[in-house]
Amino acid sequence: MNNGFFNSDFDSIFRRMMQDMQGSNQVGNKKYYINGKEVSPEELAQLTQQGGNHSAEQSAQAFQQAAQRQQGQQGGNGNYLEQIGRNLTQEARDGLLDPVIGRDKEIQETAEVLSRRTKNNPILVGEAGVGKTAIVEGLAQAIVEGNVPAAIKDKEIISVDISSLEAGTQYRGAFEENIQKLIEGVKSSQNAVLFFDEIHQIIGSGATGSDSGSKGLSDILKPALSRGEISIIGATTQDEYRNNILKDAALTRRFNEVLVNEPSAKDTVEILKGIREKFEEHHQVKLPDDVLKACVDLSIQYIPQRLLPDKAIDVLDITAAHLSAQSPAVDKVETEKRISELENDKRKAVSAEEYKKADDIQNEIKSLQDKLENSNGEHTAVATVHDISDTIQRLTGIPVSQMDDNDIERLKNISNRLRSKIIGQDQAVEMVSRAIRRNRAGFDDGNRPIGSFLFVGPTGVGKTELAKQLAIDLFGNKDALIRLDMSEYSDTTAVSKMIGTTAGYVGYDDNSNTLTEKVRRNPYSVILFDEIEKANPQILTLLLQVMDDGNLTDGQGNVINFKNTIIICTSNAGFGNGNDAEEKDIMHEMKKFFRPEFLNRFNGIVEFLHLDKDALQDIVNLLLDDVQVTLDKKGITMDVSQDAKDWLIEEGYDEELGARPLRRIVEQQVRDKITDYYLDHTDVKHVDIDVEDNELVVKGK
């Protein structure tokens, strides 16, 4: 009978299952359970022997009590604190913590709060990277040294990982049990102080929702905090403190706020000096004082989105790691192993009377031994200020290397390079060049953008092109140019495109395309406000703050730094013929479009001149160079006669429209005709362009 259940395959599976079941009935595979807990045969035998004539229930109770005693011996409340956290005080005794410099005030204030009789729970509030955790480590070191009030001289600071309290809590009540064990551990030790980094995470941590009745960590800790049964040190940022802790009034009043501000540049240098020995020992790299100062100065200037001392320490660590990788230390174990192998080879060579070979091996052994002696605990590399500059350049992509002779010459010649690309606008080029030289040489005030300029002039004379060339010359690519067409910012909601929407409006959480977000990601940029006269007046109001203070606050309250940007506004309003006598007339015309306080914020207001035919001679050469770049991809060379250039200038010259008509003529008469010729002669390697019968002709070779 053909049956899906009863066939040979099913029979074999059934027989195998029966064999497994029979095997499980053997003595070695039996499992024993008492009150739902699995016990081994040895534990059962011991329990039976201890139980004697007692009933099964009494024997089970005895077993549970024995198990609880064993658990208490192996992982009691005191041990539980060690399981879920680090004893910072013990680490301070063992010398495992970095020294804490310049935070005596905050450490003293934290110690005073801890020594209170009630509400002795300090919470360190400060932005990310200012050293909140370091202050707690400094307090642990102060306890070890005895530089604290008598009330807390015997305290042990336990850094608790909140995630370890939640780990493995798959059943209802397991998390609450962990918290109770934590509280009991603190009570039994009588001298433990818990440290919660990122303490805002305790809000709702472990809770499963209001309907289930399961409480979170903060709800369980509140009674113990109010009675003074446990003492907690917390650390969090200003935003998280405002958004989480302050919303819970009952929790807030149990903590005492200790503000942690960013240290000054001078204090940060002292901090780096204090931890220098640790980094030198770790990386085997010498770190002089001027390197430490460069870490602070360059990180302040080029990493504005982060705070001291964290960013300066990171720059120092990255630099030392980079130098250490370039000068790897001698592997002592491998070298000694190699010496041992060579000793054996030498003995074999001597036994075989190969004395020349033995002598060569001895020389190699001597070389390895010298290498071991020379590398014994000595620094193999010395960091320089130039190394710090290279690190900043790798982190930010900004060319900030220390100015050498080549850099100085490059700064001197920036105006010449820009003039070669921007034809006929020497005044504008010189004004922008002066601002760049002043900034790169370090002689600007540092509290405003590198430069802010208003370019006024007719269309097609190079206003936008100067901004593009400036981005390429300074930052190496045209992507450093942030171009905003002000015709898109003429409505009343345009401000949201600049700084993002405010709370309560659609798009509040998505500000990725705003100007402030672009500058935050690329703080070194050229910002071009094209045709600024078309912008909404609210946009101009925002620019007042940017050009005066060098910063702007976005819709989410973040302060964005514009101090490393160049701001260029272009306008067609009030342009004249470029004569000095007409400058007052130009300002008069611009006042019809812009308020005086807006015009007064610019470093310079530059009039772009009309282009004459002499200027177009240089422009046509630039346009033809662009054509040659395209032809190079095809392996084609090009020669253009002077007659052809003159013909292009004559056809493309328009005083009112500037260089754009010339660009169109080159596009139509040169690029298009070369394209047509190439399609008919795909093997062409060279083209000549000339004028015949008042027409441009292309001939190939």
From Swiss-Prot:
Record's compositionally biased regions (Low complexity): 58-72
* Ranges where the record places region I: 81-332
Entry's Gene Ontology molecular function annotations: ATP binding; ATP hydrolysis activity
Q: What Pfam families does this protein's entry cite?
A: AAA, AAA_2, AAA_lid_9, ClpB_D2-small
Give the start-end ranges of region II.
383-575
UniProt keyword annotation of Metal-binding present:
no
Residues in domain UVR? 336-371
State any GO CC term. cytoplasm
Whether Cytoplasm counts among this entry's keywords is no
**Signal peptide (UniProt feature, chain positions):** none
Q: Where is this region: Disordered?
A: 47-79
What are the Polar residues biased-composition ranges? 47-57
SMART domains recorded? AAA (SM00382), ClpB_D2-small (SM01086)
Record Gene3D superfamilies: 1.10.8.60, P-loop containing nucleotide triphosphate hydrolases, UVR domain
Q: InterPro entries from the xrefs? A: AAA+_ATPase, ATPase_AAA_core, Clp_ATPase_C, ClpA/B, ClpA/ClpB_AAA_lid, ClpA_ClpB, P-loop_NTPase
Q: Which GO terms describe its biological process?
A: cellular response to heat
This chain's function reads: Required for the development of induced thermotolerance.
What is the name attached to this protein's record?
ATP-dependent Clp protease ATP-binding subunit ClpL
Q: Which organism is it from?
A: Staphylococcus aureus (strain MSSA476)
Q: What gene, per UniProt, encodes this protein?
A: clpL
